[in-house]
Curated annotation (Swiss-Prot):
The gene is dinB1. Residues 391-414 are annotated as: Disordered. Belongs to the DNA polymerase type-Y family. It comes from Bacillus subtilis (strain 168). The record marks 17 as: Substrate discrimination. Its EC number is 2.7.7.7. This is DNA polymerase IV 1.
């Protein structure tokens, strides 16, 4: 993309939940602190922990009992989301004093485009000032990455924690990023890293030099995007309106009673797949990644995902992927809630399906029927026409809710 080089900051608050608790209670400072989902039960999971706790071997997602074994003096606190949201709002208020182009990414991190601001000629000094203000005014530590694009800024902010400021220029990518394991690259999860290793790609540098067609076959449209990022190329703008957009489309259903009945649970998934499919089609987008959520009777919650070779929006495709994930990861214990979410959305007209002969014949055969059913159901009600498999166990046993992130809803209101 032609034009002058941009100046992008990525602000990442350090151990945010634990830091907020320390800000509210000075007696906690300097002590090993963890915030856990269920403090009273030993099987609760650590959501975040202070650096003092990390130094003693405590890690995020670690069960509380295990964390206590590593650090017997660990102070475990329940989450206080009102407190975290208030601190988040205060943090973003400070950031917006420097530029209107602030893009919140989550409750504790965001991007700033400083290119056309009075601060562009003294980026490092401004970053130090922002970091100092967050520490003094909110008592919250942060790390800041400075780079010509969002991807590099994010990678830079991860390099020095806590209280780090890192400048990462595109010309430094070969020396600084390329030697790193590919799994340390932003946007590459554990499963993607394993797939890349199957191609002999172990470092970011090897990804940067990889064959684009091989990456596309392996990871779909995300493959070439990751290669660009590995080469320091990322043109996405800092977009303050991005939080108002649907980053995902999903629904969850809470069962009226805890159940381990397979047919009943599959019935819930059928309804969820239909709902997600309908919403994707109304928005004229398709999902490149699918998540399921399983919440057990003891409130332990897991999410599992799959990256799709081709984007999908049809109910049957969504259901097939959701069922596969469910039976792969369900431990047979009673379930309280199920959810399906499609993410990595792409516009329908930009998406394409690489069909083999079998799937082409199946799609060609089903498409007129699917379209007729969708039109009639939209006109006369969603229960007018259904396939035989969906008729079984149709009694209403669930309460539907949409997935939403409280933080993004909160940002929209503010």
């Amino acid at each position: 993309m032609p034009g002058k080089s941009r100046i992008i900051f990525h602000i990442d608050m350090n151990s945010f939940y634990a830091s907020v608790e320390m800000a509210y209670d000075p007696a906690l400072r300097g002590k090993p602190v963890a915030v856990a989902g269920n403090v009273k039960e030993r099987k609760g999971i650590v959501v975040t922990c202070s650096y003092e706790a990390r130094a003693r071997g405590v890690k995020t997602t670690m069960p509380v009992w295990q964390a206590k074994r590593h650090c017997p003096e660990l102070i475990v606190l329940p989450p206080n989301f009102d407190r975290y949201r208030n601190s988040s709002r205060a943090m973003f208020t400070i950031l917006r004093e420097y530029t209107d182009l602030v893009e919140p990414v989550s409750i504790d991190e965001g991007y700033m485009d400083m290119t056309d601001t009075p601060y562009s000629s003294r980026a490092l000094e401004t970053a130090k000032e922002i970091q100092s203000r967050l520490q003094k005014e909110l008592l919250l530590p942060s790390s800041i990455g400075i780079a010509p694009n969002k991807f590099l800024a994010k990678m830079a902010s991860d390099m020095k924690k806590p209280l780090g400021i890192t400048i990462l220029r595109k010309r430094q990518v070969p020396d600084i990023l390329w030697p790193l394991p590919v799994g340390e690259m932003h946007g590459v999860g554990k499963k993607t890293a394993e797939k890349l290793k199957g191609l002999g790609i172990h470092t970011i540098g090897e990804l940067a030099a990889a064959d684009e067609h091989s990456l596309k076959r392996l990871l779909g449209i995300n493959g070439p995007r990751l290669k660009n990022k590995a080469n320091g190329i990322h043109h996405a703008p800092v977009d303050p309106e991005r939080i108002y957009e649907f980053k995902s489309v999903g629904n969850s259903s809470t069962l009226s009673h805890d159940s381990s009945d397979e047919e009943e649970l599959l019935g819930v998934f059928r309804k969820l797949a239909a709902s997600v499919s309908d919403r994707l089609q109304r928005k004229e987008v398709m999902a490149s990644k699918l998540f399921i959520m399983i919440r057990y009777a003891d409130w332990r919650t897991i999410t599992r995902s799959t990256t799709l070779r081709n984007p999908i929006d049809q109910k049957n495709d969504i259901l097939k992927e959701a069922e596969h994930l469910f039976f792969k990861h369900w431990n047979k214990n009673p379930v309280r809630l199920l959810g399906i979410t499609g993410t990595d959305l792409v516009e329908k007209e930009q998406a394409y399906k690489q069909l083999d002969l079998f799937s082409f014949n199946e799609d060609a055969k089903d498409e007129p029927i699917q379209q007729m059913m969708e039109k009639l159901n939209k006109k006369y009600g969603t229960k007018l026409i259904r396939k035989g498999a969906t008729l079984k166990k149709e009694e209403s046993k669930t309460k539907g809710t949409s997935f939403n992130k409280d933080f993004f809803q909160d940002e929209k209101k503010s």
